[in-house]
Each structure stands twice: as C-alpha cells, then as structure tokens.
Amino acid sequence: MSAHGDPKPMTARKGGALTGTAEVPGDKSISHRSLIFGAMAVGETRVTGLLEGQDVLDTASAMRAFGAEVAREDDGTWSIHGVGVGGFVEPDDVLDCGNSGTGVRLLMGAMATTPISVTFTGDASLRSRPMARVTDPLALFGTRAYGRAQGRLPMTLVGAEAPMPVRYATPVPSAQVKSAVLLAGLNAPGETVVIEAEATRDHSERMLAGFGAQISTEVTQEGRVITLTGQPELTPQVIAVPRDPSSAAFPVCAAIITEGSDVLVPNIGLNPTRAGLFETLRDMGADLTYENPREEGGEPVADLRAKFSPDMKGIEVPPERAASMIDEYPILSVVAANAEGTTVMRGVKELRVKESDRIAAMADGLRLNGIEVEDGPDWWIVHGRGPGGMAGGATVATHLDHRIAMSFLCAGFASQQGITIDDSGPIATSFPIFEPLMRDLGARLDRANA
C-alpha cells in the first residue's frame, strides 16, 4: 500500500505525441541540503524553487525539531533561521523521515557530533534499508547507535560529546555516506577527510563552500580526497534551487520513446556528477539537445529538448558512469526496451538496496510486459524490441518506490496495451506534480480506482 494511505493504482496508455514544456520540480538533493545547511548556519537562509515533495517536507520538519525556524512564505520562498554548527537541540519526539534515505542519512550526520539523542524511523521501505553504512563511519567520531539487527530503523543515535575528526575511505560510492561524514565533521575540531574511489554527486562540497566552510578537493592515487576543517561559522545564503535532473529524466525519456513527441524541459541542473543518464541517452542515439547552457549558483544548467528517437541502439553503459546516474537506471531500462538490440548495465549493486531492490523490480515488471531481461548481483541486461515493441497489458508492483512507479507509467505511454502500476502514491515523495505535468504534455493516465 501507499506510504500515506490506501494504494492508488494508475494505468498509462498509448495516446498521442507528448508535446510542450515540462516544468519539473526543484532538485531533491539540493533541496535537502539547503534546509540542513541553512539550519546549521547563523542567521536567515532564503531558498526559492525548493522541491515540496514529502521527502523534503520531512527534512524541513526535522530541522524544526532540531530548533531551527523553518517557514514557507506565501510566494513559495522558504526561510530558515539557523542555530549554528553544534546548536541543534534534542527533539521532543521520534523523527519520521518517511521514505527518504537521503534525508535520514544526512540528518544522522548533522546531529552525530552534537551531544543529543535522536530516534529515527521511516516508512516500511526505509525501515528495510541498511543504515550501518552511515552509522559505522559516524562511530569513528564517537557517535553511538542503537537499533534493530543489520542496522535498520527504528534507530537511536547518541551524538559524540567530545568528537574527534576522522579520515574515512568510503567502501562503496555513496554521496549520502560522504555527506553524512562531512556533516558530522562540521562540529569536530581539526580536519575531517573523506576519500572516495569513484566520484559521486558533489552538491555537499559545492554548497558547504558557498556557506563559508573551509573545504577542498583533490584527486590523488587514492581517489577523490575531500578535506573539511571543522567548527566553522556557516554564513546564511540565498539559494535558487535548480530543477531536478532525476525528475527531468521522466518527461525526457517518455518523449524519446513516444512517437511524434517533442518536449522542452527548462532549467535543468547538469552537474557532471548527475548527468550520466543524458550522456547515455545520447550515446544510444537519442535526439536530446542542451539549449541555452549557463551557470546558476555554481551549478551548470541548461534547457533540455527531447524528441521521439526511433533509431536508438542498445549499448554497454560504462560502469564508471553508474554513480552519476544511479537513480536513473530504472527509466533507462524502459528506454532500452524501446531501442534495437541489447543494453548492458554493470556495476550497479547499489540498486539492490534503494527504496526497493530496483534491479528485481524493473526486471520483473519488464518481463511481465513482454521484454526479455537477464540480471545478476550487480548487473542487468535488457533485450530491446525497438520502438513501440513493449507489449504491455500487465500490472506491475512498485514496492513503495517512486522511481519504479514513474518508470512503468512512462513505459505505458509507448506500450501496445498500456501498463498499470499497483500504487501511484509514492510518486509524491519526489515528484508531486508528475501526473498533471504529464497530462499537460498529452499523456494518457487513468486512475484505476477512479
């Protein structure tokens, strides 16, 4: 069932071409960080373009629980009056992070070096996800964690009373783990160092520098080395959140596979640590162009124009690209199903521990709808059937995963018999306007229980 009530089945069917402009929401990663860094600054941070999905709203509630003043103004601007690094107060109640792995892991890092106790929980999906990957490095600071077996929520963290800086090499590429360690390092004296063998999204580093933290990055034989000097006074900022490339992926890919389509998706953040999907689509032969490239708030931005692309070919996606598109593999597999030939995706074991086991969820759903898929522990292969080659006709289990839900709805627009998902409710966690936005482009969506 949906995280917020009864299941909401929905069916996507083949209709006409998708045309027009898709104004997708603000970037989820930057929205979370804007609230958290604003709460750790001294003074008022103002944010426009914040994603108002449930995940981010849960983070806003957590910042209030930690003592920051967080308010949405009538014009949509968000105001955060921060309490300073180390200034968080102990919440009166359990922090419910809903479906947000990003939210809970960043919040754990943010409080880990302040001597308070915080209990975290979430929905059924979040409670099944591993948290030891975050609590293990936080323990190096002196943070203590008490929770269920295998490091799962609900979990109580007790912040370190006398935190020490750490040097930590991330065992798997994870921007969430890296960011949690950097956030903890803010309130530890001296230099905290994070080493990552593969570069992951660098919004935390860019934004911390913007808030006045002393942070540097260099590439060495060990990998990418990020050094943060602890106990700064963060300076409040005015932030314009760029549009989310992970949300843009859905109208872009839907246009590419739906006959006659031509869709413009403006103001999309194209941080190189996030743009792997768009590079991959172009490698496959998609008609995808970047218009009006520019820089806003330290982030590269462009308008994306996506058109129906009937001549796409399957490719082997470079494994080193995985970190820059880890959330986009589900929708890429839908595009691959509508390309000619075989698409191979390797080095993606992280997909097994997302909101759902995304490899299993996508493989099962694609097979039900007539696509041949092979999969293993950290790889999967989609055998494409060409434009409009997906039979459809099946109902797919979304496993409370917003990206699985949206991926199969996009698949339905180009399928022969339509595709039904068992629950559209989770879409609200990251893309609350998905349904009206796609309808405005001409998509055919039916609420199965309407």
From Swiss-Prot:
Q: Which residues bind 3-phosphoshikimate?
A: K28, S29, R33, S174, Q176, D327, K354
GO CC terms in record:
cytoplasm
Region Disordered: which residues? 1-25
Broad enzyme group:
transferase
User: What keywords appear on the UniProt entry?
Assistant: Amino-acid biosynthesis, Aromatic amino acid biosynthesis, Cytoplasm, Transferase
- Give the location in the cell: Cytoplasm
Its pathway? Metabolic intermediate biosynthesis; chorismate biosynthesis; chorismate from D-erythrose 4-phosphate and phosphoenolpyruvate: step 6/7
Any idea which residues are catalytic in this one?
Answer: D327 (proton acceptor)
- The reply to whether Protein transport figures as a keyword in the UniProt entry is no
Q: Which residues bind phosphoenolpyruvate?
A: K28, G101, R129, Q176, R358, R403
EC assignment: the record states: 2.5.1.19
GO biological process per UniProt: amino acid biosynthetic process; aromatic amino acid family biosynthetic process; chorismate biosynthetic process
User: What is an example of a GO molecular function annotated in this UniProt entry?
Assistant: 3-phosphoshikimate 1-carboxyvinyltransferase activity
UniProt key word Transferase: yes
What SUPFAM superfamilies does the record point to?
EPT/RTPC-like
Can you tell me where the transmembrane regions are? none
Q: Which Pfam families match?
A: EPSP_synthase
Reactions listed under catalytic activity: 3-phosphoshikimate + phosphoenolpyruvate = 5-O-(1-carboxyvinyl)-3-phosphoshikimate + phosphate
Could you tell me which InterPro entries the record lists for this protein? Enolpyruvate_Tfrase_dom, Enolpyruvate_Tfrase_sf, EPSP_synthase, EPSP_synthase_CS, RNA3'P_cycl/enolpyr_Trfase_a/b
Q: Which family does it belong to?
A: Belongs to the EPSP synthase family.
List the PANTHER family hit by this protein, alphabetically: AROM/DEHYDROQUINATE SYNTHASE, PENTAFUNCTIONAL AROM POLYPEPTIDE
**Subunit structure of this chain's protein:** Monomer.
Summary of the function given for this chain in its UniProt record = Catalyzes the transfer of the enolpyruvyl moiety of phosphoenolpyruvate (PEP) to the 5-hydroxyl of shikimate-3-phosphate (S3P) to produce enolpyruvyl shikimate-3-phosphate and inorganic phosphate.
What name has this protein been given in UniProt? 3-phosphoshikimate 1-carboxyvinyltransferase
Q: Which organism is it from?
A: Jannaschia sp. (strain CCS1)
